[in-house]
Amino acid sequence: MSVRLHTSAPNKPRKQRARRVLSVVAALAVLGGGLAVGGSLAYGAQGRAGHRDAVIEGAKDLVREDGFPAVLAAVGGRDGRVRDYTVGTGDLETGAAVPVNGRVRAGSNTKAFTSAVVLQLVGEGTVDLDEPIETYLPGLVRGDGIDGSRITVRNLLQHTSGLPDYTQSLPPNPFEIRDTYYNPREMLDLALAEKAVFEPGAKWQYSNTNYLLAGLLVEKVTGRPFGEEITNRIIRPLGLKDTYWPNAGERDIRGTHPKGYGASTPGSPLEDITRLDPSQAWAAGQLVTTPRDLNHFFSALLGGEVLDAAELKEMTTTVPAAEGSPTPGTEYGLGLFRTPLSCGVDLWGHGGSIHGYETFGGVTDDGRAATVAVTALSSAVAADLDGILEAHQHVQDLVDTAICN
């Protein structure tokens, strides 16, 4: 087994964003051979072998024990230096190595980007968090127990709307819909055909429909395509060179990337599902990115480079979100999870699951960052609910190891 180490210098300090200038089970449902290990160690090998080995061993367990084809990770220290890790096989057919910091589908990490765009509009005075979505999308949000005049923008971003999740109405076999293009209104109709789950504001429950509506809100108030807004407001100003919004109908992943794998039913043989129409996720999960870019984004976001102070405070004001989360004490803000780690610090980030890829990560208040990506869903490598939850927890555990050890 080979281990590659190289050093990455810290990024130069970034300028603060001036106003307008830079202008879990439900989530998982969405969206044995040789083992190769690669890593880039930004701190250098001397004196940090324990940290390096802990991350590598945890990543190896994800491949050997949980059955993920590959693991990619980026771990950043307080001084800005970064370690990159790769374990497993990037292409099960050819045996190709896992590319360092390869592109993956971001899944629900997209929600943090989407929320940031909405909160920029709040800062500009064009959107009010406590205004009903009916104000911006009149007559659109209607159904059995569903009334857009009672659901606020905050409810959407916070997952307290009570709206049913449209992904629960999609075919469960990903290979049936891998080439299907869904427009946002079509997916919204799937959700609105179901009964409201609870009264707005009564509780927290994750629903991708909330962020579908957030994307439609952005388009309505800006008059521009959502992908254009997320690119011009977030991706380009932050210099996220490996992150992009796929074009309509774009199914292949651009650039260097490991292949992603899916299963027609939980635990059945893995098949290549890299080529996928991501429209089924849209503003809730369509982005393509890398572990490094996700660390960069969350560091910039929590560092005040994306939002002004008032909007960042709103984003990081949380409610309990233990339901559906394997980690006790987890809370949710506006597009951000706050997850307590074993070393007593909180991780601010998100995570994402979309056919072929699963990610988890974020940043701490003291400047540490870590993102782990695997090239299959937990629901693809495990055959039952307990196994799915266990595999997903192991991905989260590796982030904890990377931050805390």
What are these regions (language model features)?
Residues 145-347:
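Short, surface-exposed loop or secondary-structure junction motifs
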Residues 66-69, 93-156, 198-207, 282:
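Short active-site loop at a secondary-structure junction
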Residues 76, 89-91, 132-140, 170-175, ...:
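Short linear capping/connector segments at secondary-structure termini
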Residues 8-29:
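N-terminal export and membrane-targeting signals
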Residues 79-97:
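N-terminal, post-signal-peptide region of Sec/Tat-exported proteins
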Residues 2-5, 32-85, 275-405:
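Catalytic loop of the DD-peptidase/beta-lactamase superfamily, centered on the K-T-G motif
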Residues 59, 79-80, 111-114, 118, ...:
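Residue-level preference for non-acidic, small/hydrophobic
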Residues 51, 55, 106, 110, ...:
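Hydrophobic (often cysteine-bearing) scaffold residues that line and stabilize catalytic clefts
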